[in-house]
Amino acid sequence: LLRRKSHDHAQNHDGDKCLRGASLGYYQSFLNQYKPQCILNKP
């Protein structure tokens, strides 16, 4: 569920880093690293 949501969010943005992090499965690391642009920028 989390990976799907992050992947969907990444598609809605121009975020290669978001998509890469989610697709690799390093959800926690990608969350901590890209939280400002992947999570806080959520429309």
From Swiss-Prot:
Processing after translation: This protein autoproteolytically degrades to 10 kDa and 14 kDa fragments in the presence of SDS. Interestingly, the two fragments, as well as reduced crotalin are able to bind vWF, indicating that the binding activity does not require a specific protein conformation.
Protein location: Secreted
Tissue note: Expressed by the venom gland.
EC number(s) given by UniProt: 3.4.24.-
Main location (coarse class): secreted
GO cellular component, one term: host extracellular space
Cofactor note: Binds 1 zinc ion per subunit.
Uppermost EC category: hydrolase
Superkingdom of this protein's organism: Eukaryota
One GO term (biological process): venom-mediated fibrinogenolysis in another organism
Annotated ranges, domain Peptidase M12B: 1-43
Entry keyword annotation includes Hydrolase: yes
More about this protein: Negative results: does not induce thrombocytopenia after injection into mice.
Family stated for the protein in its record: Belongs to the venom metalloproteinase (M12B) family. P-I subfamily.
Subunit organization: Monomer.
Function recorded in the entry: Snake venom zinc metalloproteinase that inhibits ristocin-induced platelet aggregation by abolishing the binding of von Willebrand factor (vWF) to platelet glycoprotein Ib alpha (GPIBA) through the cleavage of both GP1BA and vWF. Also has fibrinogenolytic activities by degrading the alpha- (FGA) and beta-chain (FGB) of fibrinogen. In vivo, induces a slight hemorrhage when applied to chick chorioallantoic membrane and has potent antithrombic effect.
Protein name as catalogued: Snake venom metalloproteinase crotalin
Species in which this protein is naturally found: Crotalus atrox
